[in-house]
Structure formats: C-alpha cells, structure tokens
A protein has these predicted regions:
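Short, Lys/Arg-rich, polar N-terminal cytosolic tail immediately upstream
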Residues: 1-17
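Select subsegments of transmembrane alpha-helices in polytopic membrane proteins
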Residues: 23-28, 68-75, 83, 101-110, ...
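Hydrophobic core of alpha-helical transmembrane segments in multi-pass integral membrane proteins
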Residues: 25-39, 75-85, 113-116, 141-143, ...
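Alpha-helical transmembrane segments
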Residues: 27-28, 61-76, 128-145, 211-212
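Terminal transmembrane helical module of multi-pass membrane proteins
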Residues: 31, 154-231
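Active-site and channel-lining beta-strand-loop segments
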Residues: 38-70, 158-167
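Membrane-water interface of transmembrane alpha-helices
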Residues: 40-45, 77-89, 144-160, 223-230
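Ordered, amphipathic secondary-structure segments that act as subunit-interaction surfaces
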Residues: 85-132
Length: 232
C-alpha cells in the first residue's frame, strides 16, 4: 500500500535538485539575457534609453545606451545570486515546497527580462505604458505569491520570517494563510490601478498603492504578532 504521508512529504519538500547548480547558472544567465538582446539591437537603439518613468508614464530619466543595456541586468544578476545563496544555505530548505522555490528562483530573471524588453520597445518608438505594465506585472506577481503563501513550510528564506512565525508552526501556518489572502487582494488592486492609470490622479495612484502594500506587509506581521499574543 502506498504511503500517503511519504507522498505528501515528497511533494512538499525541496530537494537539492530544485536548487541545482545547473538551474542556478541558467537563472543567472536568463537574468543577463537582456544584455544580449540589447547588443543585438545596438545599431537600432537610440543613443539614450529611458530608464525611469513618472506615475503617469512620462519618462523622467534617460541613460546612455551602454548604461541602459548593462546596469539593470547586472544589478539584478547580483540580486539573483544573493537569492540563490540564501536558498542554498537555508537550514530548513528541505521543508520548502518545490513550487515556491521555483517561483523564488525565477521571479528576478523574468521581471528583469520583461522590464528590459519593454525599455527596448519604448526606445524603438513602441507605444507602451511602462507604468501600466509595471503595475500589472506587480499585480500578477502578488497574486501568484499569494496563492503559494499558504503552502509554505517554515524556513528562513521565503515568507513572513519573524520570531513568532519561526518559533511556532501554528503561527507560521495561520499567518501565511492570512498573508496569502492579503497578497491576492493587493495584486488585484494593483491590476485595477494599471487599468485605471489614465483616469486616476498621480496623488490618488500613489496613495492607493502605498496604502495597499503597507497594509499587506505590515498587516501580515501585525496578524502574526497578534496570534503570538493570543495563542502564545
């Protein structure tokens, strides 16, 4: 007879293959992929590339072509290496469900590729709202994270890592169920902001964005602390 507990543990664990050297190297190379794309487009790209936008999508900072192509991917690659090291040295990495691990490994490369491709499209004259795109990407990302939050097991890398969650499995589980809901709501609101970006004023957009994401972050920690005080 098949052991259901064993199956559950295998399904919800992160073995070394999930953070293998080959996957780590591929993810870092993927983060640097925009450099290759930029070099391929070098002769077509203008001498200056847009690298920063205001709330309404107006370009408010330009960089040289070389800066625009190299700086962001290189910085993101450094961040990606830090993420990989943190995942690898986590003493509780065996407890992390493999899907959240994959999300953690690939979120930086995917965002880097998306943002840089959008920069190239805009630089080449494409009519794309970077603000709308960023809010939409953040929204999808938060909805994805929110769906995986309740499945996270205790670890030191992914999730709400405060003393109360790390010291109590019950606190961890309840906190991440609540955080999952908050993240999904925040993601939906971010997508709505993206769709209404041309309607909302700059001030309203900033206020809604800040309130939603502060409530998501602080609310998750506050709920964890409340559980600690109530349940010990």
């Amino acid at each position: 007879m098949k052991d259901n507990n064993t199956d559950y543990q295998n399904d919800n664990s992160c073995n070394n293959s999930n953070i293998s050297l080959s996957m780590a190297v591929i993810s870092v190379i993927a983060t640097l992929l925009p450099i290759i794309i930029g070099l391929a487009l070098w002769n077509k790209l203008p001498d200056e590339l847009p690298v920063h936008w205001g709330i309404k999508g107006n370009v408010d900072r330009l960089a040289t072509k070389a800066e625009g192509i190299f700086i962001m991917p290189c910085l993101c690659a450094i961040i990606q290496i830090g993420v990989l090291i943190k995942l690898y040295i986590d003493p509780r990495k065996e407890q992390i469900h493999h899907k959240p691990v994959l999300v953690s490994i690939w979120i930086v490369p995917l965002i880097t590729i998306l943002i840089n491709v959008l920069i190239y499209i805009i630089a080449l004259g494409g009519k794309v709202s970077m603000t709308m795109a960023v809010f939409f990407i953040i929204g999808v990302m938060f909805i994805g994270i929110g769906n995986y939050m309740p499945k996270l097991k205790q670890n030191y890398t992914i999730g709400i890592k405060v003393p109360w969650t790390l010291n109590s499995e019950e606190n961890w589980n309840m906190t991440h169920r609540m955080a999952g809901k908050l993240y999904v709501v925040a993601g939906v609101i971010s997508i709505i902001i993206a769709l209404l970006n041309n309607v909302l004023s700059d001030e309203v957009t900033i206020i809604i964005f800040m309130v939603v994401f502060l409530v998501t972050g602080i609310g998750s920690v506050a709920y964890s602390f409340w559980l600690y005080k109530v349940k010990g």
